[in-house]
């Protein structure tokens, strides 16, 4: 038996192997960390690095390239900077920063990278989206036409917000800015419980630079009220690095865009963009960028405009989804003419202005109706709201003017006294306790009681009690009237509502 292998056979096998050899050479752009300070790593050798590219260090910590020089790249670290040292290698990934998105994140508390921090296990999301993408163009949008109810009388009646709008909440510290945003999120439960999955409003709350105790309190309130099940909380607290505080709103916006681009509706609250601008200023100064006004870098306007422009009401061809933004700005001593407040005011579609003076007088929410405005929301109001609330803002303006005049102690004619009396009752009607949102029909019924003059004979101190009794009467004995108010506020419904109001007011005489 001949076991020898012929040379020809060997040659054939070698030729076959050479022909089938798949030489896949992958060239990586690798650099070396030459210095690290305050969360910024200076890396030498990343010649092919691109601005915004994700870089991975030796120990698996990631970073983003936010500065490019001749020989070095400045990389902002996302993670424990102490685990990155001089001499470590840094490798370009060729990717942009992305985060997990989808329904799996609902009810969870995550950090700026989408990692869960609530101790409830991993987030099993299969979809990831880049944190920074271009805002929808002109053709991809349509005008704001659907209302987004906050459940707060003074806002829904006088400063209405529509789906796809950017409405700024601005005011000094401790004036109730976060309270309005949280009430709006809680109010969506009234809406979500009665509509299909496609029509639900999903919510995202972004905490930037806040105390962890305050974030925990908000999460607990959302959980107790049943709102956490349709809400994502993205937290970058005061103890987190500036890189996380900078990235958090963009990451949250990407999560919201998942709902918007799939024909659904999402509400996102940025709390707050003042701290976001401060974090970006700190990061920019560490990156050796030249400072401008108030030491902010020159592109601080673009920082917020590219974020807020991603909120939109999409066209029917794009699924008709929406992303509504409620950015929050904290002012110092009521100064709305500072750099960041004026920037965000010019970007947004209106502002809800909260004043300390009004707050300390006991008027909550402390909204200054005269300075607050909604530039596009009125187009989204339902007919019953337009009928009832159309004249309220004008009558309140007349009331404030006469109130200033009356302080001088001059004699007031009968008409002016009537305007003052009705104005005081109207202001009392617009007061509302925190965490007690009202449906649109309930708001219309309450405001109608004030505008129709039915409360003129009730003392101002009893207006709050009257409101409680009216809402109780409507919900217990006349639920069909409330549904008719929402659908079509006809003269018949109006007459029936007047009878109910008269019945309630009679108990105060």
Curated annotation (Swiss-Prot):
Main localization category: membrane
GO function term, MF aspect, one: ATP binding
Catalyzed chemical reaction(s): ATP + H2O + 4 H(+)(in) = ADP + phosphate + 5 H(+)(out)
A GO CC term attached to the entry: proton-transporting ATP synthase complex
Membrane topology category: Peripheral membrane protein
UniProt xrefs under InterPro entries: ATP_synth_asu-like_sf (IPR023366), ATP_synth_asu_C (IPR000793), ATP_synth_asu_C_sf (IPR038376), ATP_synth_F1_a_nt-bd_dom (IPR033732), ATP_synth_F1_asu (IPR005294), ATPase_a/bsu_AS (IPR020003), ATPase_F1/V1/A1_a/bsu_N (IPR004100), ATPase_F1/V1/A1_a/bsu_N_sf (IPR036121)
A Pfam entry, by short name: ATP-synt_ab
Subcellular location: Cell inner membrane
Binding residues annotated for ATP, in chain numbering: 171-178
Keywords attached to this entry: ATP synthesis, ATP-binding, Cell inner membrane, Cell membrane, CF(1), Hydrogen ion transport, Ion transport, Membrane, Nucleotide-binding, Translocase, Transport
Assembly and oligomerization: F-type ATPases have 2 components, CF(1) - the catalytic core - and CF(0) - the membrane proton channel. CF(1) has five subunits: alpha(3), beta(3), gamma(1), delta(1), epsilon(1). CF(0) has three main subunits: a(1), b(2) and c(9-12). The alpha and beta chains form an alternating ring which encloses part of the gamma chain. CF(1) is attached to CF(0) by a central stalk formed by the gamma and epsilon chains, while a peripheral stalk is formed by the delta and b chains.
Family: Belongs to the ATPase alpha/beta chains family.
Function per UniProt: Produces ATP from ADP in the presence of a proton gradient across the membrane. The alpha chain is a regulatory subunit.
Protein name listed in UniProt: ATP synthase subunit alpha
Species assigned in the record: Ehrlichia canis (strain Jake)
Species lineage: Bacteria, Pseudomonadati, Pseudomonadota, Alphaproteobacteria, Rickettsiales
UniProt gene name: atpA
């Amino acid at each position: 038996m001949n076991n020898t292998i012929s040379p020809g056979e060997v040659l054939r096998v070698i030729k076959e192997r050479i022909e089938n050899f798949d030489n896949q050479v992958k060239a990586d752009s690798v650099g070396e960390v030459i210095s690290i300070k305050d969360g910024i790593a200076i890396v030498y050798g990343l010649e092919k690095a691109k601005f915004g590219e994700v870089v991975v260090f030796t120990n698996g910590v990631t970073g983003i390239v936010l500065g490019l020089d001749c020989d070095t790249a400045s990389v902002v670290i996302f993670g424990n900077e102490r685990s990155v040292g001089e001499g470590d290698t840094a490798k370009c990934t060729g990717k942009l920063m992305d985060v997990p998105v989808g329904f799996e994140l609902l009810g969870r508390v995550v950090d700026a990278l989408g990692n869960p921090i609530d101790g409830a296990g991993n987030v099993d999301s299969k979809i990831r989206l880049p944190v920074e993408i271009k805002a929808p163009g002109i053709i991809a949008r349509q005008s704001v036409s659907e209302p987004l109810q906050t459940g707060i009388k003074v806002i829904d009646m006088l400063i209405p917000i529509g789906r796809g709008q950017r409405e700024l909440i601005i005011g000094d510290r401790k004036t109730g800015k976060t309270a309005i945003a949280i009430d709006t999120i809680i109010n969506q439960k009234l809406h979500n419980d009665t509509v299909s999955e496609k029509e639900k409003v999903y919510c995202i709350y972004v905490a930037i630079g806040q105390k962890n105790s305050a974030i925990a309190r908000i999460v607990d309130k959302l959980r107790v009220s049943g709102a956490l099940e349709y809400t994502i909380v993205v937290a970058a607290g005061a103890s987190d690095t500036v890189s996380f505080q900078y990235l958090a709103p963009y990451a949250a916006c990407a999560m919201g865009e998942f709902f918007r681009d799939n024909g659904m509706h999402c509400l996102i609250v940025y709390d707050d963009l003042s701290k976001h601008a401060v974090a970006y200023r700190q990061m920019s100064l560490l990156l050796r960028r030249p400072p401008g006004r108030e030491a902010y870098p020159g592109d601080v306007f673009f920082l917020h405009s590219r974020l807020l422009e991603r909120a939109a009401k999409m066209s029917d061809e794009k699924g008709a989804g929406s992303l509504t933004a409620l950015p929050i700005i904290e002012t110092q001593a009521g100064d709305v003419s500072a750099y960041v407040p004026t920037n965000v005011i010019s970007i947004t579609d209106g502002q809800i202005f909260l004043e300390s003076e009004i707050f300390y007088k006991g008027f909550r929410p402390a909204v200054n109706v005269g300075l607050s405005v909604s530039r596009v929301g009125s187009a989204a109001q339902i007919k019953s709201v337009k009928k009832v609330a159309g004249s309220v803002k004008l009558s309140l303006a007349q009331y404030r003017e006469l109130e200033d005049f009356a302080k001088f102690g001059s004699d007031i004619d009968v008409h002016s006294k009537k305007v003052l009396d009705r104005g005081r009752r109207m202001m009392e009607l617009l007061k509302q306790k925190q965490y007690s949102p009202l449906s649109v029909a309930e708001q219309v019924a309450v405001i109608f009681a004030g505008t129709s003059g039915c409360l003129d004979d009730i003392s101002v101190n009893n207006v709050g009690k009257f409101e409680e009794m009216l809402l109780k009467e409507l919900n217990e004995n006349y639920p069909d009237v409330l549904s008719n108010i929402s659908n079509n506020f006809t003269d018949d419904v109006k007459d029936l509502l007047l009878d109910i109001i008269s019945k309630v007011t009679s108990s105060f005489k």
